[in-house]
Amino acid sequence: MIRYKFPKAIFVACTASVMIVLAPAVNAQSTELKQVFAQLGATPVVRAQFEQQKKLASLNKIYVSKGTVLFSKNQGVLWQIQSPVKADLVVTPRKLVQKTQRTTSQIEVDKTPYGSVATMFLQLMSGNEAALAKNFNVVSANYSPMQWNVSLTPKSSLFKKLFVQVDAQGQRYVDRITILEQANNRTIIRFSQQTAQPQTLTAAENALFQLAK
């Protein structure tokens, strides 16, 4: 197995963004929170375009990356980054795999601190509400059929090292995620063209997920 250290900026932002999709389950006592969770968790496959803007306060510079994301409850999460470089990031319960045109690198989730983040998210996809309750406080949650928003702050020391607060908003799906990180850095991820179709994964998508089995 190839030992590989995944790029922190891409992995943290992507992982945080996929976690937020199921973060409304943190507080089972909140009616609005449960409504958000039920709405977002009702679809087994979601596809979307994404644009990530990462602002580094110390450099006063914004880095932009774009691509597509595929969320599958049965398989995992597939981020296909199209710019500024092309790469696929596959997250499954066992492995994290990054594939480029020239290389394929993988690491088992229990061999890296970030693996625990990915594992926790995948547990949430199967309905393990207790996992987020161990790591997040819900600052606010508002729901209506036309609009919802959720704000979270981390409990665990691991997440506190990564970010200060996560805000998400959307309608039927997640539309925007704002991650306030340490040192006043900020990552904004916007999702567009969200769709639940096609539900069936392509041969190429299945092949990528097989790399992380």
Regions found by a protein language model. Give the residues of each.
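Acidic/charged, solvent-exposed loop-and-adjacent secondary-structure segments enriched in E/D, K/R, S/T
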Residues: 100-123
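N-terminal mature ectodomain segment of secretory-pathway/periplasmic proteins
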Residues: 42-93
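N-terminal secretory signal peptides that target proteins for export/translocation
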Residues: 1-7
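Bacterial N-terminal signal peptides
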Residues: 12-21
